[in-house]
């Protein structure tokens, strides 16, 4: 309030002699009024937001930024701000600053909802754009007021930028990119070596060697069939598979003798022939 009084008193001496020329739609007060309306619209959208689609808030923010930018361009391209117009600025600027502060407080309060909706990064970008636009407006106004009032005008209009900076700081830890990618790379190279080599090549003597049968008959007294399969598992299969080692018996000894005599007999026959 003291600042507003100083600003007003500084202009009072020359304001009485200056006629009020209203530039409809392009005067600083009109520009501030338009920005104030857009700020109200943005704050209403923020208050109404409870999660989900944030497009209404984004649209209202874009409208505000556009209005500030257009107002800044109008001030830059226009005439210098007269003492009378400058005298009319403190009250609407201070009112606008309060509205901006309220909107920023509301958008900070809804931070978790915006982040959950994946819009935290967009809100942060919008706040940065608002801050940049507000800085441009403050610079434009300051450049157009009388030299003796530039410092005061800069301090007054910078209040809006300060308010927005609070929101920028609140969202600075939010990721710029919205959506989050959960690329979980899993390498499951499992080498299962099931080379189980079962040596079941059991030579099974299915011939019941008796004392009367000295020479093996055609039924095959001892069949040793080691048939290698595709899994490299040598298996010996006879007519009767014995899982225990063969017992050394007298009958086995006789069978061995019978085999030997049979071999000699066969050799003798071959020679005789």
Curated annotation (Swiss-Prot):
Describe how it is modified after translation.
Galactomannoprotein, glycosylated.
Identify the InterPro entries for this entry: Cell_wall_mannoprotein_1
Signal peptide positions are: 1-17
**Per its UniProt entry, which superkingdom is the organism in?**
Eukaryota
Q: Where is this region: Disordered?
A: 173-247
Q: GO CC terms on record?
A: extracellular region
Biased region (Low complexity) positions are 177-247
Question: What does the UniProt record say this protein does?
Answer: Constitutive protein of the cell wall. Antigen target of host humoral immune response.
Q: Which family does it belong to?
A: Belongs to the cell wall mannoprotein 1 family.
Output this protein's name.
Answer: Cell wall mannoprotein 1
Per the UniProt record, the lineage of the source organism begins with: Eukaryota, Fungi, Dikarya, Ascomycota, Pezizomycotina
């Amino acid at each position: 309030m003291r600042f507003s009084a100083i600003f007003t008193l500084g202009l009072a001496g020359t304001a009485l002699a200056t006629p009020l020329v209203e530039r409809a739609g392009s005067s600083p007060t009109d520009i501030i009024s338009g920005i104030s309306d857009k700020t109200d619209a943005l704050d209403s959208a923020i208050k109404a937001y409870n999660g989900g689609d944030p497009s209404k808030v984004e649209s209202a923010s874009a409208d505000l930024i556009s209005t500030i930018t257009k107002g800044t361009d109008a001030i830059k391209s226009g005439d210098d701000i007269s003492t009378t117009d400058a005298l009319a600025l403190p009250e609407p600027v201070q009112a606008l600053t309060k509205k901006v502060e309220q909107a920023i407080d509301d958008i900070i309060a809804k931070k978790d909802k915006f982040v959950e909706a994946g819009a935290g990064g967009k809100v942060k970008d919008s706040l940065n754009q608002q801050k940049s636009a507000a800085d441009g407006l403050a610079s434009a106004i300051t450049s157009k007021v009388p030299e003796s009032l530039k410092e005061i005008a800069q301090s007054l209009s910078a209040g809006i930028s300060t308010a927005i900076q609070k929101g920028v700081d609140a969202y600075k830890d939010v990721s710029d990119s919205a959506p989050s990618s959960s690329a979980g790379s899993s390498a499951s190279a499992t080498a299962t070596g099931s080379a189980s080599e079962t040596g079941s090549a059991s030579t099974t003597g299915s011939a019941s060697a008796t004392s009367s049968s000295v020479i093996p008959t055609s039924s095959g007294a001892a069949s040793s069939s080691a048939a290698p399969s595709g899994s490299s598992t040598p298996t010996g299969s006879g007519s009767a598979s014995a899982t225990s080692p063969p017992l050394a018996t007298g009958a086995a000894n006789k069978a061995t003798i019978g085999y030997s005599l049979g071999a000699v007999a066969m050799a003798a026959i071959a020679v005789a022939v």
